[in-house]
Amino acid sequence: MPTIQQLVRFERQTSEKKTKSPALKSCPQRRGVCTRVYTTTPKKPNSALRKVARVRLTSGFEVTAYIPGIGHNIQEHSVVLIRGGRVKDLPGCRYHVVRGSLDASGVKDRKQGRSKYGGKRPKGD
């Protein structure tokens, strides 16, 4: 434990928190242009073809972003909105594409959790 004199000479250092999504630069979302759209396989023990996009952001970063939902219309040169949020079984994928905004369309025929996928309200209700 430091003495009062030591505290006068050297103040306590506050530990700086490291952000989990540095490419957003403290913004809730960022716009970017897709440079490559492809599928990749998850870590063990999972097995799938996960849809991801390489996106060049307005902040200057180029990141890998996951495209959630069933089916998408994103292709190269599509302008998309990116939010934070990693995909646990895809190493290096720390961002999500926001469905239903800019060039990314919402998921069709989605009944539940529509707000997360930009789905339109069904006609029957």
Swiss-Prot record:
CDD domains in the cross-refs: Ribosomal_S12
Pfam family, one: Ribosom_S12_S23
PROSITE patterns in UniProt: RIBOSOMAL_S12
InterPro entries the UniProt entry points to: NA-bd_OB-fold, Ribosomal_uS12, Ribosomal_uS12_bac
GO MF term set: rRNA binding; structural constituent of ribosome
Region (Disordered): 104-125
One Gene Ontology CC term in the entry: chloroplast
Alphabetical UniProt keywords: Chloroplast, Plastid, Ribonucleoprotein, Ribosomal protein, RNA-binding, rRNA-binding
A biological process from GO: translation
Basic residues biased stretches: 113-125
Main location: plastid
Location in or out of the cell: Plastid, Chloroplast
Quaternary structure, from the entry: Part of the 30S ribosomal subunit.
Entries under HAMAP family matching the protein: Ribosomal_uS12_B
PANTHER family, sorted: 30S RIBOSOMAL PROTEIN S12 FAMILY MEMBER
Family: Belongs to the universal ribosomal protein uS12 family.
Its biological purpose: With S4 and S5 plays an important role in translational accuracy. Located at the interface of the 30S and 50S subunits.
Protein name: Small ribosomal subunit protein uS12c
